Amino acid sequence: MFSPILSLEIILALATLQSVFAVELQHVLGVNDRPYPQRTDDQYNILRHLGGLGPYIGYNGWGIAAESEIESCTIDQAHLLMRHGERYPSTNVGKQLEALYQKLLDADVEVPTGPLSFFQDYDYFVSDAAWYEQETTKGFYSGLNTAFDFGTTLRERYDHLINTSEEGKKLSVWAGSQERVVDTAKYFAQGFMKSNYTDMVEVVALEEEKSQGLNSLTARISCPNYNSHIYKDGDFPNDIAEREADRLNTLSPGFNITADDIPTIALYCGFELNVRGESSFCDVLSREALLYTAYLRDLGWYYNVGNGNPLGKTIGYVYANATRQLLENTEADPRDYPLYFSFSHDTDLLQVFTSLGLFNVTDLPLDQIQFQTSFKSTEIVPMGARLLTERLLCTVEGEEKYYVRTILNDAVFPLSDCSSGPGFSCPLNDYVSRLEALNEDSDFAENCGVPKNASYPLELSFFWDDLS
């Protein structure tokens, strides 16, 4: 006889079995196999929290297409300002890392446990101090490969602006004179020109000296009033670092980790990734501590270099104003090709970004982490950071017009108050007016306190220099 109870049991069993199969199917397929992912795992990507000291990471944009071709538009002039690629620590940071390494090595710990358990078989990641300051050459995040690969990417993008069949023409590439910057420029140029590199590229190294004045990519060196130490690490509370030290001393006893060691561990993670492509130190810090150390870097960048520094905008305007002059010249470019590729340091890039008004945010607080801000140094000036400024010639309503498009770290970056053009670009005339208005008080000689008898150049002219 039919039993309602038995039927219910069967129904429940079938439902359970169906649920198990569904879970197994989801496990096999994985959430990332869905047509459109529903997770935001990239927020946990450690490369987004290294304060500009780790490998390149693209900017989190707005989903705007960055293709070289926009309907009814062509790129007819382009500027690149790029930071050198991934590098070894500086000499000073290297000493700081060595000190932590020696401290951990000397600790009276027979068998390490917890997050620092790997240290039992760990060797310092820089085999020779001569590597300090240099570009990295191998691993997943090789700085030289970053430069070469980006050169190949831009060649595809700007191929229509290069005619390699014309004899005697050269592509000029400018770089700060520090070795890693020049190396970046050379490897980029090799990627861009391939086998024609030696014949068709001239890499111009601009001295990073006061005597170079404003005719350089490091104008800050010639600004006597510039103070790059407005913010100091001790200006922000270290309660998070103290909690993290307590956590590590509980989980990995015997190493006597202090609050001062926490930012150094973060440095270890970033630079070892640059060199080896992996780092066990990246798994040592808690998420809270990692966000804390990243914010310390943000504060340093903001107050010592960017918007929070009274001279950041003035110094950055030297380069921004020179590119403005080239963008306005729609008759004929002064060089063989309408391409202006420049290479420098993170500091110099951020000062240019400031003069362009890319990150006009309220001052970062010095008592708590500001999460709701667009000023994230990791996304703004990672190793290999790059700013593209493209002039577009577009046909709009039957008339040819010029526009300017800004691309920061591979993401189209619409200007907050000027994005009415194709692809959210800015009309050229409006771009110029906006830049001049933002920098009406950016008088370098006056603001920087340049002596009246200064013998160094007071304008950037290398884009036009040495023209036959």
From Swiss-Prot:
What the entry lists under Pfam families is as follows:
His_Phos_2 (PF00328)
Signal sequence span is 1-22
Q: Quote the gene name from the UniProt entry.
A: PHO1
Q: Quote the InterPro entries the UniProt record gives.
A: Acid_Pase_AS (IPR033379), His_Pase_clade-2 (IPR000560), His_PPase_superfam (IPR029033), Histidine_acid_Pase_euk (IPR016274)
Active site per database record: 84 (nucleophile), 346 (proton donor)
Q: Which reaction does it catalyse?
A: a phosphate monoester + H2O = an alcohol + phosphate
The UniProt keyword set, sorted, is:
Glycoprotein, Hydrolase, Signal, Stress response
The keyword Glycoprotein appears for this protein = yes
Give the protein's recorded name.
Answer: Acid phosphatase PHO1
